[in-house]
Each structure stands twice: as C-alpha cells, then as structure tokens.
Amino acid sequence: MLGASSSEEEDDDFQDDHESQLPIAQVKKRSLLSGAMTPRSSSPAPSDSVSQTNSLKRNNSSSQARRKDSVHSQTPARSPMKMNSPSPMPQARTMSNVTRPVLQNSQELDGEEIEETEGSGTMVASDDGGPSLSKEEQERIKAEKEEEEHKKNLQMYVFIARCVAYPFNGQQTGDMARRQMKVNKPELARIRERFAQFLRGETNIAADEAFTKAIQSYTEVFLKSERVQKVVHAGGFSQHDFREVFRLIIEKRVRSLPDIEGLSKDTVLNSWLAKFDAIIKGDETDQNRNARGRSRNPNSAMSADAVLGKEQLYDVFQQILGVKKFEHQIIFNSLQLDNPDEQAAAIRREFATREEALKDPMKMKRLTPKFVVKDMETLYMDEVRMSINTLIGNLETVPVTTRGQTVGKRKDKSRSRSIEDLSLFNSLKRRTSSGSLNKGDSDDGDVTLTKSDVSLALSMEVVVMEVQGLKSIQPNKIVYCVMDVDGHKLATDHAEASKPKWDTQGDFTTKTPLPTVKVKLYTEVKSLVSFDDKELGKIMITPTPNCSRNPEWYTMTLPKNSQDSSLKIRIAIRIEKPPNLKYSGHCWCIGRNSWKKWKKRFFCLVQVSQYAFAVCSFREKKADPTEFIQLDGFTIDYMPESDPELSAQGGKHFFTAIKEGDELKFATDDENERHLWVQALYRATGQAYKPVPPKQSTIAPKAQGFQDKASKHGMDALIQADSINFDHDHLYSDIQRLTLDFRINEPICSLGWFSPGQAFVLEEYSARYMVRGCFRHVTLLSNLLDKADDGLLIDPALIHYSFAFCASHVHGNRCMPDRQGPEGVGTVTLEEKEKFQEIKERLRVLLEKQITNFRYCFPFGRPEGALKGTLGLLERVLMKDVVSPVPPEEVRAVIRKCLEDAALVNYTRICNEAKIEQRMGNDVSPAQRIEDMIRVTEFCIDLLKENEEHHGEAFSWFSDLLSDHSEIFWSLYSVDLDSALEVQPHDSWDSFPLFQMLNDFLLSEPNLKGGIFHNKLVQQFQPLVVRYIDLMEHSIAQAIDKGFLKEKWESRKEGCATSEDIYWKMDALHTFVIDLNWPEEDFRKYLQTKMKTLTSDLISKVSDCTFTAFDSWMQKAKKSTDYMLPSEVCVQINVMFSSKSRAVRVTVDSGEYKYQSKLDETLETMLKTMESCIQEKLLGVLESVLSRLARYDEGNPIGAILNIAPKPASIFNKLKTMAGDTSVQSSSSTRQPLTAQQSSGQIGNSYVTFFHGCTELLRQVIIDEIWVNGLFEHWYDNQMKAINDWLTERLQQSLSATQFISLSNIVKKVYQDFAMQGIDEERLNSKTYQSISRRLQLEESNSHIQEGIRRLKT
C-alpha cells in the first residue's frame, strides 16, 4: 500500500515475493482494518463520517512497489500482470480505459507497467525477453486473469453479504432525492418524432397558434440542439429537465402577452404544460411500448431508488460483482446469513481479533502505515481504539432477535430503561476480554449480572385435542378438560363422552423455562348432593423450550375408583422462546466456582445484550435460576476424550468452557446435542478460535454439508477467509468503482449519486471493516473524475461534498474532537495526502474546463444548479486549507480566464456552424459576406441571450466577469465584422441592417450598452451614416430639379410621380435614422436636426416647384364656359397637401409647447393663394355669363335685336313654309314657344355644364376633402353674391325671358349640386339665396301676367 513503511523493507520484499506465488486460499495478508468510526449520517454520499482510519496491518512491500500500486489504485485500470499486489487477491483485470493517468513526482511507471497500461496486442513479449506468447497462451493467461478477478469479486461479495445480512451501523433511508428516468438516444429520437408529428398536425392535440409557435421554437432551439444530444449521451437529462426547460421558455413568453379578461396567465401555463406532457408521452402505443421496455429492465425506475429489502440488495450486488445465483446460495448457506445470532457472533469475533492485534505493540509499530507526521502513530492507536469502541457501541444498539427474525431497528440510546439496564449498557462496551480496550475504562471492573438480568418470559400454547379409552361414563355425558399452568386455568369446550374431541387452545405466559402443565378431565355431575364435577383423569407435563410442537399422546393418571383401564389424551404444546433465550437443554455439568457437583441440570443460554451472555441452570417451576455464570472471557471447545470418572456417573459427549481461574465441563447424552451447545456457546463467547469436532465424531452437521459444497466449487477458502487479513481500503475502492459503473448504467438520471440501497451497503461495509473515510472519499473522487473525463455528467454537489471531507481531513481541521485526537486533529497517511493533491489538481483542471465550456456542459441551465455548484466547488478547490478563505481576487482571476477561453470556444463553434471561414474567399460577393455576418450575428445574439437567461443566475456573483466575457466574445466577432466591411463597395449600404441588429441588442443589455464593442461599433458606422445621409440629400435634391422639369402632373397616390418618389426617399431616410436608434446623444441630436433641416429644405423646394407650375397653369385659364379646370391643377394641390403632412415633423420644441415652423406657415399661405386663384378663375366664368345676359336688358338696343332675331330653328321653319309644306308649318308653329324657351336658356345650360364638371373634378382628384368643402362653400357664397349683385342692379327693370330662364337654371343647379357635395343646408339657404329666389319668383309672376294680357289682346 502507498505510504506503508517499515524498517525491515528487505525482509518484507522477500516475504511478499513468496506470498505472491501462493494460491489465494493460502495468502494471508497481514492487515488489520481499523479506523475512526462515526454514526451514519443522512448524506447521500457513501459516507459523511469523519475520516476512517485505515488498516493496522498493511502490505510490507518496498517503497518502489508501493509507488507503483499507488498509481494503479488511483486509476480504474490496474496492471493485470502485476504480482506484488497489496491485496491478498491477485490484481483485477482492467475494467476501464484511462487515457492520461496523472502522475505525481513520486509516482513513476517502469517500462513493464507502461507496456501493460497501453493496451495489449495480439503478441505479448515475455518478461525475460524471450519469444512472443502464442495465441493459446494468451487466451490461457486471459482466462486465468478472469478467474482470479472472479475470485476477488466473490471474496468482496462475501463481505458485502455479511453487511447486508446484519447491518448494525445505520439504516437504509428513503428520504434521498428521488431521481428521474434519464432520456437516452432512442428516447430522444422518439421525443423529436412526437413533436414533429404535432407540428405536422398528425396528433389529436388541439392547440392554438401561440402554443404551436412555442412548440416550434422549443423544437428548433432545444430538441434539435447538438448540446442537448451530447448531454443525453452523457446521461444527464431526464424528462423532467425537458419539461422544465419548456416551462421556463413559455413562462417568459406568456408573461409578456397582454392580459385577457377572464383568462389568467397561470391557466394558460397549466394548459400548455398539460399539452406538452401529452405530446412528450405520445399515444397509448408508445406508452405501452415504453412500459414494456422498462419492465424488462430488472433495475427499473420504479424500484431502483426505493428502499430495498435484503433479497433485492443481494441481487443488486450479484449483478455488480458478477456473482451467479448458485454461488450466492453457497455463500448464503455457508455463512448462515439468515441466522442473526451467527452474524452477530461473527461481528464479535472480528472485534476480538482486532483487539488482540492491538495488544502487540511491536506488531502494531511494524504494521502502522506511513503518516505525513511521525507523531501521528500514537494518535493512530487511539483512533483504532475509538473506532472499535464505536462499533461495539453500535452493535449494542441492535435489539436481540431470534433466528429467522429480521434485524429490527436499532435501539434508541435514549429510550427508557431500568437502572440495571442502564448500568449494564454503559459498562458493556467491551466484552471479549477481561481488560478494557480503552485505558479510561479499566476502572470499571467486571460487570456483575443479577438474576433479574437473565429473567425469561415464555409464551405457551396448549391445545387439548382428544381423549381415548373413556368407557366409565355414559356416551351422552358431557366431558371437558381444564388446563393449568402456574396457577392459571383455562377450560375447553364441552363434548359428549362418545366423541371426546376438542380444538381449544389455551394461551399462557410463564417466566420459568421448565413450566408444569396440568390437564384434568372432568364430567359434569347434575346432582343436588354434589356441587363439583367428577374428575376422570389427570396428567402433569413438564415441557421444555425445545420440545416438539407436534401433538403427542399422554397416559393419564386415573382416580382410585375409576372403572377405565387406560385413558390417553392427545395434547399439543408449543413454547415460543423469547428473543434472549438462545439455546436450552439438559446437560451434565461440573465447575470450580459454580455447579460444583456433577449433576444433570436444565441449562439456558440467555443473551442480556449483544456482548453479555449467561449460562443459567433452572429447576422446575422456578423463574429464577439456581446458578448462572457470565460467559465473558470463556473459551468453548470440544473434549476429544471423555472423562472416565465423570462419564461413569452420567454423560457421554463432553465439551468444556475454560477461563482463567475457572473451568466448566459439560456432557450430553446425544452427540448432536453437544454440537448444538458448542455452536451456541461459540457464538456467545465471541472467541476467535472455532471449535473443531473430534475426528471420532460421527455427527455430520448441516453446516458441514454446506462447507463441503463450497469446497467442491473452490469457494471454501473465500468463505472461511478472515476479514482481518484483507486490505479493505482497496477492496472497498474496487466495490465502490464497480457500484458506480453499475449505477451509471441504470436507467436513472443519477448524476453519480448512489441509490439508497447502494449507499446503505457501502456505508455499512466501510463502517464494519473500518475503511478510512478520507480514503473512501478520495477514491470516490477519483472514480467520479474518471467518469467526468469519459464525458458523463456528474453532479458537482456530490464532488463538492467528498472534496470538502477530504480537505478537512488532510488539512487537519476536524470539527469532532470527541471522535478524533486532541483538538479534532486526525491522522493523515502519506497515500491519502498524495492522492488528495492529485485529485485536487485533476479537479481544478476539470472545473476550469467545465466553466470554460459551461454552455455545453450545462446546456440551458440543466441540471438545475449544476453550474452554480461548479463555481462554488472551484472556490473550495482553490482554498489552501479549510480555514483560510481564498482571496476573492484569485477566484475571480481563474473565472475570468475561464470565461475568456469560453468566449473563444463559443465564437469558434458559431463560426464552425455558420462555416464563416469557408466563405471568406474572393469568390464570395460582398453582399453575401454581409448576409453571412447577419446570420452569424443572429447566432451570437441568441447565444448571449441564452447565457443571460439560463446561466445569469449562476454567475450572479460574477456578473461583471460575464459582461467581460461578452465583450471578449464581441471583440472576436468584430474581427470578422471588420473583414466583411473592408470588402464592401464604397457606395454599398447593405451593412446598415447589421448595425441596427447589433445596436438594438446592445442597447437592450445594460452591461453591454456603451461598452467597448458598442463604442467601437458606433465609431465605425458613424462616418457611414453621415455619408449616406449626405448622398441621399444630394440625390433627392437632384430628383427635385430634374423631376419637376419633366413632370406631367398625373395623379399618383397623394401627389404626382416626382413628389411621390421624393417623399418616399425622404420617408425612407427618416425611417432609417429612427431605426438607427443612435446610442450617442450628441450625434443623435445632430441626426434629428439634420433630418429636420433636410426635410424642411426638400419640402420647400417641392412646394415652390409645385406652386410655380400651378401659377403657370392658372394663367392659361379662360372665362368662357367652354373652359374646364385642369386635373393637373388638382394634382398640384395634392402635392401641396402631401408636403404639408410631412412638414408637421419639422417642429421646434420649446418646453412643453410646440410651435409651427415657418414652413407650415408658407405652405398654408400657398394653399390659400391657390384656393383664391381657383375661385377667382371660376368666378370669372360666372361673371362672363352674367355679362352675356346683361345684353338682354330692357332698353338695350342690342338686347332688343337679340330678342327679335330669329333663331336657327325659326329660319328653318320659314324655309319650309316657303316650300309649301303647310303641315310642317302648322306643326312648327305649335312648337315654336318651346323652342324659343330652350334657346333662351342656352347660356344658363352652358354654365351649369361647366360648373358640374369642375365640382366633380375637384371632389374626385383632390385628397383633402376639408379643403375641397371650404373651396365649395366660398365658391357658392361668391356665386350667390355675384348673381344677387347683378339682379340688384336691375331692380327697376324686368328680366327678359332669356335672362330669367338662364338665371333660374343656374341658381337651381348650383343649389342642388352643392347640396349633393355636402354643403350645409343652412349655408346654402342663405339670405342672398333667398333674395335671389324672391326676385326670380317675382319675375316669373310678371311673365305669366304679361303672357295673359297678350293672349287677351289677340
């Protein structure tokens, strides 16, 4: 063993060389396992007790051999060809591959061992440099190694089976964290397929669009993630983890949604989770298939983490150690694992052997391991004494049980006891020798038992069944029996004398082991003279606890005047032995101090406690023993020859009990009885020597048959091996390693934690065989680190616990001084310290690697709390000792270095995923380079968001370092960004979306806003933004100059083609500046001012050009009714309104108020001018019409001529008359008045047509209805005013027919059209309109009067 030193190393090496060549049964490794033992705690680790002291007896190999063994003991792979093994068994074959064994300075591998650890080929060189081994020899050697490995596993199983059969150091707890089923690769594939089916709509699960999107996001981000696949391969994900990740994702999504009245967000979450469960579980077919698959697994999740019974524990460790069923059965029978008395006796014998080893100082000095400090040897002896005393105390707490009864719960040390029990318990911590193991206990003296300590309480069942030979009474008489035990009487049922049978059981309790059972047979007597029933017979029986339980016939004693010749009764007596009665029977005995006369007596072996036994002799009907002795210090053995003098008086088969100052001789009449007595007393004394029956013995006990069967299979040496001859530290290490391998392969997401049953057995093994606590934990750490190196996921809390225990032990800061040496300092072996230093370095490297790859070791923050635990463990590993905390700067420096490396790892993986390096050649276009960078940017942003969402809480104490990590990450990104921007053309603006994406993300992160990368990004894009705005300004200005020169003023949306193009560009530029969301306030204000100025200038130019064009078009207007308002003018008005709507953005803020700019005032003035101009041109047409009508005034010569002048129709009619067409003439004369009327209204009709066309054009083309309504209102008012003024000028004269007809038509149509255009009736029916209407009505009346007068005259 590493660190075991001796002053006789040469002799030790010589002896080891010979021992390595002996068969396994003959190898007696001189080791005594001992250690400081503490009560079992609730820790899920194999043990949380303070350090277990290691074996007193170590392998005496040389220093070099110990170094070699140390190397192999620290790695799962041990040298298969090594012969100088520290274990009594040959070395185990390689169980796992270790790629890089970490060697300390004192640990070196010679050439032979290096060759062995590097793997084997088909040809192996021999040790003497001879020819290579043949394939047959290799197979033979391999078979031998496997056989030796199997024997070693069998030997370990023997010790494990003893621990399972009789645990006394703790209980199996069921309050450990319940582990979930882990998701394996096939299960992950099935889950992915189920979610794909849901997204394809192939399931019957109803879902809305929001839930479908959530499932789609979950599938793309989580289920299809390569990181999740790796962790599933590492056995670190359960379905619970899958559900928790989904819950976290949807919680954030649902909480961000607006509240819906009547539907709480918790209800939505629960509904979504229920649907998620339905998807992940699949349909009934999938569930049944999974259930069948799991039922075929013997270690299913339903029972793996439950509290296991003994048979289940046996089965588990049979699988772990590769033990076959028949081998287990042989071990079970040979060790009598179902006999708690035998198991307790075996434990007492183990303790006795250890105590004997402690009595030899020279031997102890030679076998003491090498410590880091020489003075620890004395402390080591004290630790061993304390450990044994602790084990003895633990054994004392186990209640006394009978054979076949399961060992119950440990007795509570604080339970109520009698004064005798308390004094007995407190003084019986050392029972196997007269002297105390602890010097402080030597003053207690011998323990004296009283008769009350050995009192017994037996339960009896007496069943009277039937009577034969009853002939003295009539058949119809009633008979019954009375049972009497120590004065307690019970009667049977009544029966007829013809059928005297009963099935009545009497239950009695007695304190004497030899009770007297009296049974009397009575018949009922119905007589006035006699009041007592008649006794027909009686029997008195003295049963023993060993009597047969089968019914027996007894001959009853008859009364003197009985007429029956023979009366027999059938009785069954069953006596339940109390737990403290281990054996009883009749023996001949003689002793020096007790039982001084050779006489046959009834003896009972009574167990008072686990270490106190007494042999008592009892008489009939007596509850107290006549004499008794305490078996403490006696040695039981067979007597090969009978004592002639004593055998002449009685007894055939002798055995003795010898003690210093006393000797007892016993004899039995039956040889089997003697064997049973010897075995019972042998278990009670706890002696190391096992009595061997004399050769002339003809009895073949059952145990001998089991031993013969074990010998037949070559297992007798393993079963009979003394545990003290084994190095249990290394055996435990192997068991722990194999158990961990088995646990990792279970379908449970254990993360390295043992199941309750496995932890319980390992705890019991380490306690019973006193495995050093530090060695246990340091080997567990080594095994866990090996698993972590293999890519499996291990809970850092488990590593943290074991590491903290080892650190406290190695640094000498123990917190339990009562269990250790003075001031809590315990012994530390050189091997423990070297292994701890090695583990500490390995653990530091592993933790730094995990923190560097935290996204891949703990994806999506799973397992829960693992990353936070890793950071805490790293801080513990960096501590120099357990008292002085590590400086925060040192911890931060390590974490900073890890996060710096993490930035490189994360960005490199993103680049590999996006294949960015492969797309940086000259064959890739600049636009494609920007697209690639946008895709990489999306990956980077998603990555940092995931870091904050899933890992931010773990880094809460190092949030600034996580921010630095992000800055470094972006600095790596900026290299590729610069490369992509350098190849962009001078006039390309494709990179602005990239800037907007980055800037928006950085602004949303308080830790990155205004950081190094953000400032660099701003400085990099600021010149591009300025140049882009300048170019856009120049481009828009040129578009204004060139566009309006060629503008055709056709309607386009809100304006013309040129204005729409210009304003689209201006709006796009404005949106671009807003979307930039520039982070620097100064430049942001500059951009805002720049955009206001640019907008104002551009609008001014557009409005000026439009107004100029409007003026030119209006100058072409005519006053004739043939003139129609051009649509181009309406389009120009639309352009002005479009300009006005955009001019609203150009405002000047002054406190809480906003004032319109000069541009608004200018545009408003232009619109008013344009309205006035249009009205002026339209009114000019009306004025022209009124001027034409003025020519028809009365007294106006021109008007008279116009009134007399024939119309074209009348001239045509006259030509027809001249031709002689009288019919036509008469017809024309009848229609002439109507034709004249139409001719008179021609002027009015032409104006109405002009008016109607203009109103429809204005309403359809101009977009601002309010402005159009205002124009119509003013136009209407002006028209009515003009007509009214014209009529007012002619108040003194009547209107001609032409004037009347034209004005009536104009007024009527104008009123109707403006009413249809939406002008208020109140405005239409103005006073002016009413005045016009009255005048026209008056003129109409005058016209009718004059027409009537003309008709009268004619």
UniProtKB/Swiss-Prot annotation:
Pfam families: C2_CAPS, MUN, PH. InterPro entries: C2_dom, C2_domain_sf, CAPS, MUN_dom, Munc13_1, PH-like_dom_sf, PH_domain. Residues 580-686 form the PH domain. It is found in: Cytoplasmic vesicle membrane; Synapse. The keyword Ion transport does not apply. Residues 1-148 are annotated as: Disordered. Keywords: Calcium, Cytoplasmic vesicle, Exocytosis, Lipid-binding, Membrane, Metal-binding, Protein transport, Synapse, Transport. Residues 134-148 have a biased composition (Basic and acidic residues). Residues 7-16, 109-118 have a biased composition (Acidic residues). Residues 975-1106 form the MHD1 domain. GO terms for cellular component: cytoplasmic vesicle membrane; presynapse. GO terms for molecular function: lipid binding; metal ion binding. Residues 52-64, 93-107 have a biased composition (Polar residues). Residues 441-558 form the C2 domain. It comes from the Eukaryota. One of its GO terms (biological process) is exocytosis. Residues 39-51 have a biased composition (Low complexity). The PH domain is essential for regulated exocytosis and binds phospholipids. Calcium-binding protein involved in exocytosis of vesicles filled with neurotransmitters and neuropeptides. Probably acts upstream of fusion in the biogenesis or maintenance of mature secretory vesicles. May specifically mediate the Ca(2+)-dependent exocytosis of large dense-core vesicles (DCVs) and other dense-core vesicles. Specifically required to activate the neuronal G-alpha pathway. Functions with G-alpha proteins from the same motor neurons to regulate locomotion. Involved in regulating entry into quiescence triggered by satiety. This is Calcium-dependent secretion activator. It comes from Caenorhabditis briggsae. The gene is unc-31.
